[in-house]
């Protein structure tokens, strides 16, 4: 056996696992083969436990394949593998002029901002203390994003830099940004963590140019420990801002300072942003946040009700969650309306009461999302005819969109499987069930299918 054993395992795992899972959990592992023991070193306890729980069978299976009777014992440890005399430490190439250190006086606002009249901290974190990992409701739709954010919070500037989170409005991207910021500052009280919307970066740069203070602007942004920027897509067509952010990005990365970005779309799909920036957005880890599935929507409602000290019956939470599906913000807004109505009227929160309190919202939702609407939207998306979806044709170009439309009908409407099958050319309910399971499987395996599903959900729910 040789040290190339782990490289062989990596190659196979990269083929077998979804790219996001491989990048998040397997790539950070370091391996050391000593005698008949293969030690795998994880960057932290969270990764170690996850790999041991989820992937140990995959790894042991590959070791059996490659080693036969001489399978090494597998050992997991937290930390870096010991550096042997033959190992040469990696060299970092600095390709820019080193940035001047941050000013020691942190009791004033950045000097490019001439609106300052009262002293305040230079590093205005803008991190909302209310958004933490503890009150972020985890589900299948956001599990990877939360896990990635948690790892970044535990090890900023490490393996996942930058971290790029993308997904539709109101799905929890901003919550995770604040959660990371709060966690970093809890571990290190003097950490320089800055959260902002991308438009704030643009405004600060314009102010710096107007006040002839661009060097101070650069020094400020390049000396933070963690830069958290929301809605990076608003950099589109702002060439000077992109130019400045490009150099800021490079400086932070070379200084092992953490960058987290969010967007409403996949990096390569952001129009009006330079290719060199889009390429850098994908250097670390890119993770999607999907619209929450039913169980997560119910959990969000129950947790929100608990925070408001409201007893929300389970059947009521299920009723709301089944009908409002697009995002977390919509769910919370609906629950706030229900709670307010209950407080004003003194009535108990029942399904009938909720149906009355959310009458306009539920009517709009039911009007927007119908099977007919789903069929038209899917047909347009895949550039086929609605008649193709209803036909007996089984070619891939028609069968896959048909399965997608059936899965969306199950997700977005209250129709039963037989009713959905009926609407698709009189198909049996087992055909609909197979379609739903197939799309669920493909969303795990195929980035394209996952993107298609998210895009269609977003279109139909907007």
UniProtKB/Swiss-Prot annotation:
Single Gene Ontology MF annotation: lipid binding
GO BP field: DNA replication initiation; regulation of DNA replication
Keywords: ATP-binding, Cytoplasm, DNA replication, DNA-binding, Lipid-binding, Nucleotide-binding
Location of the protein in the cell: Cytoplasm
Region Domain I, interacts with DnaA modulators, annotated ranges: 1-86
InterPro entries assigned to the protein according to its UniProt record, in alphabetical order: AAA+_ATPase, Chromosome_initiator_DnaA, Chromosome_initiator_DnaA-like, Chromosome_initiator_DnaA_CS, DnaA_C, DnaA_dom, DnaA_N_dom, DnaA_N_sf
Chain residues that bind ATP: 170, 172-174
Region (Domain II), start-end ranges: 86-125
Recorded superkingdom: Bacteria
Region (Domain III, AAA+ region): 126-342
Coiled-coil residue spans: none
GO cellular component, one term: cytoplasm
SUPFAM superfamilies hit by this protein: P-loop containing nucleoside triphosphate hydrolases, TrpR-like
Disulfide bonds, paired cysteine numbers: none
One Pfam family named in its UniProt record: DnaA_N
Principal cellular location given in the protein's record: cytoplasm
Residues spanning the signal sequence: none
Region (Domain IV, binds dsDNA): 343-462
Task performed by this protein: Plays an essential role in the initiation and regulation of chromosomal replication. ATP-DnaA binds to the origin of replication (oriC) to initiate formation of the DNA replication initiation complex once per cell cycle. Binds the DnaA box (a 9 base pair repeat at the origin) and separates the double-stranded (ds)DNA. Forms a right-handed helical filament on oriC DNA; dsDNA binds to the exterior of the filament while single-stranded (ss)DNA is stabiized in the filament's interior.
Subunit structure of this chain's protein: Oligomerizes as a right-handed, spiral filament on DNA at oriC.
Family: Belongs to the DnaA family.
Notes on the domains: Domain I is involved in oligomerization and binding regulators, domain II is flexibile and of varying length in different bacteria, domain III forms the AAA+ region, while domain IV binds dsDNA.
Name of the molecule in the record: Chromosomal replication initiator protein DnaA
